[in-house]
Amino acid sequence: MHYDPIKRQAGRIFRSKGGRVVFFRLLNLLLLRSWYIRKEIRKWARFATPDASVLDAGSGFGQYVHYVSKLSGNFTVKGIDVKEEEIEICNRFFRSDGHGSKIVFEKADLTTFVEPDAYDLILCVDVLEHIQEDVLVMENLQKSLKKGGCLIISTPSDKGGSDVHKNGDTSFIEEHVRDGYAVEEIEQKLGRAGFRRIESLYSYGKPGQLSWKLSMKYPVKMLNLGKVFFLVLPLYYLVIFPVAMLLNSRDLYKKHSSGTGLIVKAVK
């Protein structure tokens, strides 16, 4: 299943300033990983300096940059991505939103991007599973953090991530170069990259897995059949939305012994 074309189409639909804000709110509600990432950002922000610098490594639509910018207007935030179209859209939106030089987006490849000792927080949300040279990226992000800075990662786990549950299954998202990480694997790789304190927790337990199927997997499968299904989606979500919200909330506040996602925090 090709996921990127659907994402590009959605991003183009919500290009206007008001549309982009609505789009961010929808993403934050529907994507369970956003619930986890925003929770971790809030924890970090309680102890952050007023002039903290943040990097979103693989910024995509820019929803996490937008969230961080609303926590404090004094934070300096940079988003980087390999997709030039998204970089242009994000720069245009944030300039129109009055952020000036505090927020900027740049095209960059994480396998070569390094800004030594520049950031207090780096986000890497659903990115590493797309990159073969993952340890190299981890090393670059470690170098780019200030001492004591924190890296927050969201990625599929090896417990059914990318909808791969047994031998012979293929990834739901064909753009992934790996189906998911074992906790031991990603922690060892981060240790090799120079991080000194690493914490991992499972996301997408049973409630989250059901929510993901209802709110993401089935709609994406429909949209891959044809663009006409964009007309059906509002009615579909009208029914599914309350159920997905209850499931996401349940997943966020329950400790999982296993899950199809991982949230990892690593400190330099």
Task: Describe the predicted segments one by one.
Residues L136-K147:
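A short glycine-rich, Lys/Arg-flanked "PGG" loop and its adjoining helix->strand segment in the class I
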